[in-house]
C-alpha cells in the first residue's frame, strides 16, 4: 500500500492544465493513485447536449457502513494572461513558504491532502469499520440562453 506526501501530490496535480472542462489526463492519474491505496475506482463521463463532456471519478475503500464521502474538484479557471504571472501557473513553485500554481488554493491541494491522509489512515487501519469514498469532479458549465 502506498502512502502519499500531500505537498508532492499537490505539485503533481498542479502540473495538469485542467482549465474547465478539460480533463488533461488528471482523472486517470487520480485513479492510478487511488488504486495504489486499495480503492476500487470508476471514471464516469457526463455530457449534456452540445456541451463538452466532463469526467468524474468515484472510488471506494471498504464496503461497510457508515460511508465517509469527500467531494473535491480538480478543474481550474483560466489563468488569464500568462505574462501577468511571476511563474508558469502550471509549474508548481514554492515561494516564501507558499505553494504557487493554478489550483494550489482551490482545490487541488485539498484533494491531495485528502488522498495523503487516507493513504496514511488505510496503511494503519487495514480492517476499519465503514468505507471511504472520494469523488473528484470537473465542473460542467452550461451556456446561458440569451434573451
What are the roles of these predicted feature ranges?
Residues 2-100, 123-129:
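Acidic/His- and Gly-rich active-site-bordering loop/insert found
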Residues 70, 99-137:
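Alpha-helical metal-binding/catalytic segments enriched in His/Glu/Asp
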Residues 78-79, 108, 140:
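Short, well-ordered, mixed-charge alpha-helical segments that flank or form enzyme active sites
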Residues 138-144:
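Conserved small/polar residues in nucleotide/adenosyl-binding loops
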Amino acid at each position: 500500500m502506498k502512502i502519499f506526501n500531500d505537498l508532492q501530490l499537490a505539485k503533481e496535480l498542479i502540473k495538469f492544465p485542467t482549465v474547465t472542462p478539460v480533463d488533461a489526463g488528471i482523472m486517470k492519474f487520480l485513479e492510478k493513485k487511488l488504486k495504489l491505496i486499495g480503492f476500487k475506482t470508476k471514471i464516469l463521463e457526463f455530457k449534456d447536449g452540445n456541451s463538452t463532456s466532463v469526467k468524474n471519478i468515484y472510488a471506494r475503500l471498504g464496503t461497510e457502513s457508515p460511508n465517509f464521502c469527500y467531494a473535491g474538484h480538480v478543474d481550474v479557471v483560466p489563468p488569464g494572461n500568462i505574462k501577468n504571472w511571476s511563474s508558469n501557473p502550471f509549474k508548481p513553485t514554492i515561494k516564501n513558504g507558499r505553494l504557487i500554481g493554478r489550483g494550489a488554493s482551490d482545490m487541488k491541494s485539498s484533494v491531495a491532502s485528502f488522498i495523503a491522509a487516507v493513504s496514511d489512515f488505510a496503511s494503519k487501519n487495514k480492517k476499519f469499520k465503514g468505507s471511504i469514498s472520494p469523488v473528484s469532479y470537473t465542473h460542467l458549465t452550461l451556456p446561458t440562453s440569451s434573451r
